[in-house]
């Protein structure tokens, strides 16, 4: 062969293409070694223009691209003799729990790497994250998964406020074990939480049956139903327990949820046949009778056009008011009506068995409010067998004076009732409190206490009738003073 021309040598030496030769040093192995040295020189050389260089793999694909990562990962799996990883399905499993990795994190490019990653680094970063088998957590950490806890462990976690689950307790036996364990720790919140779960997961018949021999749990369940206002279920429970009187009372309380007075009256009427105790039965009967009467009075007084309704207009309806409020209303607007009318105070007193003391106190307040002092006197006037009139009261007269004073009774009326107080010291105390001058002066005179008269005289205005009266007593030589 003829030697190449000098210009040909210059061409082959300067071009990136090399001429074909049969020399041993130009074989494929030599070219691979040269390429590796070239790559290593690039890794060592930290050129400032690195951002302008596109890094490619042996196949010409950009390093870090999705296709490159997939191909590199797949090739690493095929070389199983070196890595010895088990062969698994490469399809992603979306149903696995507890995995913090995602498909996007597999191909997430790093920002501005300072150097190429080696082949082993690329392999460990991709395949280990994606294809390594997911290891089970140690058994000691299994307690964090609450599905395998025993009743005792579940209750302890509930007490400590840690995560728990009662859904695994599906059989009746397991649920009762859970309830018994809750009762044994004497924690009301835990017992109530378990009862709520049993209420949701058991029929009421089975739940009622199992609660009967468990008195503590039963009391908590009854209290829970009361607090939640589940009256209907509570009535069924009490009936199943044979507690008929309690059941009747709970059913009676349903009237509080009825707003319409007519429907409430009818409901109360239906309650009369319930198995109440004797005292409770009387109470329910009175409640029904009172509401029935209030409806009649309310309908009549709405249309009333008498002077008292014009002078003192009603401020509220009488419906659903207590019996004493109804009596006060009757004494205020219907005082003096014949006993045969529903609105008569005497009729109400007789129908509902109101005591004399309660009746006098209520009527006194109503008539004193109207400044009807004649009616006030008539409440206390009684005749003896000789026909003489005398004031008598089932309540103490100092209480009568208090009620009269609150309703701005004149001094003459107050003094009349202060004089009826039997205890001299109490009489003097009440008289001083309400400035009943005549009673104070007469009391000091009866006690022959000259010094107290002098002291009290200084509290009065000069030339007032009371001042002159004290002066006359002090000048009276017939009185034997103690001091």
Swiss-Prot record:
Biological process annotations from GO: cell differentiation; hepaticobiliary system development; intracellular protein transport; spermatogenesis; vacuolar transport
GO annotations of cellular component type: cytoplasm; early endosome; late endosome; recycling endosome
Any coiled-coil regions, as ranges: none
Transcription regulation recorded as keyword: yes
Main location: cytoplasm
Family stated for the protein in its record: Belongs to the SPE39 family.
Full protein name: Spermatogenesis-defective protein 39 homolog
Species this protein is from: Danio rerio
Gene responsible for this protein: vipas39
């Amino acid at each position: 062969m003829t030697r190449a021309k000098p210009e040909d040598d210059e061409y082959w030496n300067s071009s990136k293409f090399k001429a074909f030769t049969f020399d041993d040093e130009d074989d494929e192995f030599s070219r691979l070694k040269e390429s590796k040295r070239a790559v290593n020189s690039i890794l060592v050389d930290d050129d400032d223009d690195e951002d302008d260089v596109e890094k490619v793999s042996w196949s010409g694909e950009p390093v870090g691209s999705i296709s490159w990562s997939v191909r590199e990962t797949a090739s690493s799996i095929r070389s199983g003799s070196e890595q010895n990883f088990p062969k698994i399905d490469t399809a992603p499993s979306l149903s696995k729990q507890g995995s913090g990795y995602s498909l996007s994190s597999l191909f997430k490019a790093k920002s501005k790497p300072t150097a190429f990653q080696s082949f082993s680094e690329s392999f460990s970063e991709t395949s280990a994250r994606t294809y390594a088998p997911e290891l089970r957590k140690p058994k000691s950490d299994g307690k964090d998964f609450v599905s395998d806890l025993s009743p005792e462990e579940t209750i302890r976690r509930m007490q400590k406020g840690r995560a728990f689950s009662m859904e695994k307790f599906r059989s009746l036996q397991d649920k009762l074990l859970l309830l018994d364990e809750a009762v044994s720790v004497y924690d009301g919140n835990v017992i109530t939480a378990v009862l709520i779960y049993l209420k949701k997961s058991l029929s009421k018949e089975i739940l009622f049956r199992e609660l009967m021999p468990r008195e503590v749990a039963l009391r908590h369940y009854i209290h829970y139903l009361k607090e939640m206002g589940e009256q209907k279920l509570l009535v069924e429970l009490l009936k199943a327990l044979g507690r008929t009187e309690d059941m009747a009372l709970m059913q009676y309380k349903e009237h509080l949820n009825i707003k319409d007075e007519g429907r409430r009256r009818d409901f109360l009427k239906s309650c009369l046949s319930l198995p109440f105790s004797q005292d409770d039965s009387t109470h329910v009967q009175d409640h029904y009778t009172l509401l029935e009467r209030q409806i009649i009075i309310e309908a009549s007084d709405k249309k009333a056009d008498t002077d008292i309704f014009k002078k003192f207009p009603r401020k509220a309806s009488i419906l659903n008011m207590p019996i004493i409020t109804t009596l006060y209303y009757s004494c205020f607007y219907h005082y003096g009506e014949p006993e045969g009318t529903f609105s008569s105070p005497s009729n109400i007193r007789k129908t509902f068995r109101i005591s004399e003391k309660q009746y006098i106190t209520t009527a006194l307040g109503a008539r004193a409010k109207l400044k009807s002092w004649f009616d006030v006197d008539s409440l206390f006037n009684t005749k003896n067998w000789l026909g003489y009139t005398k004031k008598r009261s089932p309540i103490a007269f100092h209480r009568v004076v208090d009620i009269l004073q609150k309703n701005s009774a004149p001094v003459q009326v107050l003094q009349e009732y202060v004089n009826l107080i039997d205890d001299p010291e109490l009489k003097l105390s009440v008289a001083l409190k309400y400035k009943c001058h005549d009673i104070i002066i007469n009391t000091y005179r009866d006690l022959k206490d000259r010094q107290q008269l002098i002291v009290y005289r200084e509290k009065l205005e000069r030339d007032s009738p009371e001042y002159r009266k004290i002066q006359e007593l002090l000048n009276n030589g017939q009185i034997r003073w103690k001091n």
